[in-house]
Structure formats: C-alpha cells, structure tokens
Regions:
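Conserved alpha/beta-hydrolase
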Residues: 41, 46-70
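Short beta-strand/loop motif that positions the catalytic acidic residue
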Residues: 210, 216-218, 222
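N-terminal cap/lid segment of alpha/beta-hydrolase-fold proteins
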Residues: 1-21
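Active-site glycine-rich loops that stabilize anionic/oxyanionic intermediates
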Residues: 26, 34-37
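Alpha/beta-hydrolase-fold enzymes
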Residues: 105-189
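Short alpha-helix in the alpha/beta-hydrolase fold that links the catalytic acid
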Residues: 212, 226-235
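Catalytic active-site module of serine/aspartate enzymes centered on a nucleophile-bearing elbow/loop
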Residues: 241, 246-273
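Catalytic nucleophile-loop/oxyanion-hole region of alpha/beta-hydrolase
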Residues: 36-38, 65-95, 99
Length: 273
C-alpha cells in the first residue's frame, strides 16, 4: 500500500490530504470523514480497499485533523462543497481516466450527498455511511436558539457537539482509541452545525433529483444520527441501495458489523464498474 500526503489551499485554509494507492487501480474512492475526527482514522478501510484494487484519496475537513483553521468551524456550507470538488479533482489528477466514487461517513455522508445533488455528474457512484441527514436526538432548545443567534452575530464561536464517545462503537477498544486520539475534538460552530442540519433536511426533500447510484448503509442502534432519515432519503430516490445493520452503533466501520459492512461496500463498488 503506497501512501503519500499532499496539501491544497482554498478559503485561506491549507487542507491536509492523503492518498493510498493500490497496485492495480480499478477505481479511486474519494473519502470524506465525520464530525470531530480526521482522515487518518480510515487507514484500515484504505488498506482493505487497496487489497481489492481500489485506491483511496482522503482529506481533513475545515476545522478538523491536520487542516489549518479554527477547530469545528467552516466559512459556509458552500465552502464545504467546494472542498469536496477540489479533492475530487486531486483524485482525477492522481488517477486519470479512472472511475471515481465518493464515500462519506456521517458529516462526510451529508457532504457527498449534497455535492451529488447540487454540483456534479461524472461520478461512478456514492457510498454514504450513517449520513448526517437527521439527528437521532433533539438538541436542547436553548442551545439551538443560542446557536441561531450566534450564527448571526458570531458564527465562528464554538460549543460542544453533543457526541458521546461511547456511542460511536460497541467495541471498547474503538471507544478508547477515539478518546485518546489527539486530533479528535468536540467543538462545533453554529456555522457548521446549523448548515449541516438544514442541508440534511434539504437532501431528504430533494433526493428524487439524484442521478448517480448511491449505496446507503446505516445501523439501527445509532444514537447520533437517525437511521430513519437515511431510510426516508432512500424512499425518495430510485437510485439508492439501502442496507441497515441491526443494533449497530454510529461508526459501523469500527463496530461489530465492520467486516460485513466492508464486504458490502466492496461488492457494491465492483457491481458499478
């Protein structure tokens, strides 16, 4: 597995990216991580995909990982979609004339779905795992009201993101690794949280506009993102393949169902080539 790091620059931000190259690349997977984490947490996925001749290109979002800027903040949702566009172009430059798939988890799942709906054709397909379309909990009303006020007067102020590390996986080692990862944070600005909540609602309502095949994977035990939002999205488009894993936790690629889930991803990608 050949690995290289790279950077790109937009919105006065230096983005950190990495590429894991397969020996014989049949397709390239552009990966977008979830809230509070970073692309380095997907090395095991990249390794498995590489073993099946799929190269992987990933990056750290605004306010995350090794990308510069204030933790948990982005300039706008449009800027998020532009960062996805740039990483896709990077992938095309690394692997010319190669089919490209977008793969997003949670927050990244929201980003790739909205990108596909608003920005693009020319993708082979999309994989979205536990996509942030609908929260599994109601944010405290006072916190939501404060967030809306701050978005108007101080959009970069950050507060806690309400994620409980114990809710990411049923495997204790994964929870401990998450807690002890120095690049993981729990910060989020109103400009980040509210725009993703709104874009998730919009995506569900406009799913019928999707023109690209999408694999939707979610777990019924997710305490962070409501799997029923993913179900509703699937119902609203003819392009979706949906699979639910019973009782799993939010990070299904780090949960007890991870082997089955990765097999499903690999089989679906292969079916789209």
């Amino acid at each position: 597995m050949a690995h290289k790091e790279f950077n790109f620059h937009i919105y006065n931000t230096t983005f950190y990216g990495q590429c894991w190259k397969a020996k014989n690349t049949k397709a390239v997977i552009v990966l977008a991580h979830g809230m509070g984490e970073h692309s380095g947490r997907y090395i095991h996925i990249a390794k498995t995909l590489n073993e099946h001749d799929f190269s992987v290109v990933a990056f750290d979002h605004f306010g995350h990982g090794k990308t510069t800027g204030k933790r948990g903040h982005n300039p706008s949702f449009e800027a998020v979609l532009e960062s996805v566009a740039v990483i896709i172009e990077k992938a095309r430059a690394f692997f010319p004339m190669t089919p490209v798939f977008l793969y997003g988890h949670s927050m990244g799942g929201n980003a790739v779905i909205n990108y596909a709906l608003k920005k693009t054709t020319h993708l082979q397909g999309i994989i979205a795992t536990s996509p942030f379309l609908k929260l599994a909990f109601e944010p405290p009303k006072i916190k939501l009201a404060l967030g809306k006020l701050l978005q108007k007067i101080a959009p970069s102020v950050t507060i806690g993101n309400e994620i409980n590390p114990n809710d990411i996986s049923r495997e204790k080692i994964e929870v401990d690794t998450y807690i002890n990862d120095p690049l993981i944070h729990s910060k989020i600005s109103p400009n980040f949280s509210l725009t993703f909540i709104d874009s998730g609602k919009w995506a569900i309502e406009n799913a019928s506009q999707l023109t690209i095949p999408i694999l939707l994977l979610h777990v019924t035990g997710d305490k962070i993102i409501d799997y029923r939002g993913t179900q509703k999205f699937a119902e609203n488009t003819k392009r979706a393949t949906l699979k639910l894993y019973k009782n799993g936790y939010h990070e299904l690629h780090n949960d007890l169902c991870k082997k089955e889930m990765l097999e499903d991803v690999i089989n679906w990608i292969s079916s789209q080539l």
